[in-house]
Amino acid sequence: MTPPEERQMLRETVASLVAKHAGPAAVRAAMASDRGYDESLWRLLCEQVGAAALVIPEELGGAGGELADAAIVVQELGRALVPSPLLGTTLAELALLAAAKPDAQALTELAQGSAIGALVLDPDYVVNGDIADIVVAATSGQLTRWTRFSAQPVATMDPTRRLARLQSEETEPLCPDPGIADTAAILLAAEQIGAAERCLQLTVEYAKSRVQFGRPIGSFQALKHRMADLYVTIAAARAVVADACHAPTPTNAATARLAASEALSTAAAEGIQLHGGIAITWEHDMHLYFKRAHGSAQLLESPREVLRRLESEVWESP
């Protein structure tokens, strides 16, 4: 298990890199780039942090970390809406590692950041799909590697996360699916928590500086209560996601996904309302968080599908 002090150091290192290289202007530049992410920042994350090697065992050239370590990095990237291939790459690595004999060469390339990975849960909406080199699909309880495939970018609500429609041309079976969709849900939930925390921070800062009726709007009791409620919602969701990272069961994954989706959607909606008209100007970041909230809530599975699955799991429990 990674010691808490090392995990905190990891968080601080990633946060420092993001603060230095992924400000609002840099995020917008990455959104508009050919590959949809900042390649120089990606190299820094791989070389200085080992972000793409965290979940790979040391004997295969990785850092030998845990799911919680990857979640910390994803959370910090989500906080700043950093366009990054880390989520898809990490999931592809975990899928490859599930095989009886993992492809060491592919894992090395992914760990170094020289190859980009993608996991196919829904072939119509694949994260990193248009830039992926290594693709693994999870269908009908099996993991399959797509050795040849075609990719077509699709329109998205969230400009900070590109998706693509993939079609397989040649495949090879890997192994039974150990539940990679649950892992994907947990990592996405961690990303949502980071974004929700930043939404609250932006809203509190604005409420302290925006003056109306001769006083900052944040001093009004009604707004204080709304922001306090939002803080509690995010803190509770953060705890649920942390628990899922340490015990990634299907029920915990579904619960984390629902809690994080609710936290981010609520934080983004409150942020839009409390900022007022400035929140929907292109120059402000809040509208990007709003789009990320709604795009992420529907990614992988819709909240309704997660609730339906969670309901069946709960009722089947002894």
Swiss-Prot record:
Cofactor requirement: FAD
UniProt keyword terms in alphabetical order: Cholesterol metabolism, FAD, Flavoprotein, Lipid metabolism, Oxidoreductase, Steroid metabolism, Sterol metabolism
One function term, GO molecular function aspect: acyl-CoA dehydrogenase activity
Any GO BP: cholesterol catabolic process
Pfam families: Acyl-CoA_dh_1, Acyl-CoA_dh_N
Residues that bind FAD: 210, 277
Cofactor annotation comment: Binds 2 FAD per heterotetramer.
Top-rank EC class of the record's enzyme: oxidoreductase
Catalytic function, reaction form: 3-[(3aS,4S,5R,7aS)-5-hydroxy-7a-methyl-1-oxo-octahydro-1H-inden-4-yl]propanoyl-CoA + A = (2E)-3-[(3aS,4S,5R,7aS)-5-hydroxy-7a-methyl-1-oxo-octahydro-1H-inden-4-yl]prop-2-enoyl-CoA + AH2
Signal peptide: none
InterPro entries cross-referenced by the UniProt entry: AcylCo_DH-like_C, AcylCo_DH/oxidase_C, AcylCoA_DH/ox_N, AcylCoA_DH/ox_N_sf, AcylCoA_DH/oxidase_NM_dom_sf
Pathway: Steroid metabolism; cholesterol degradation
EC number: 1.3.99.-
Function: Involved in cholesterol degradation. Catalyzes the dehydrogenation of 5OH-HIP-CoA to 5OH-HIPE-CoA. Can also use octanoyl-CoA and dihydroferuloyl-CoA, with lower efficiency. Cannot use 3-oxo-4-pregnene-20-carboxyl-CoA (3-OPC-CoA).
Complexes and interactors: Heterotetramer composed of 2 IpdE1 subunits and 2 IpdE2 subunits.
Family from the record: Belongs to the acyl-CoA dehydrogenase family.
UniProt protein name: Acyl-CoA dehydrogenase IpdE2
Gene: ipdE2
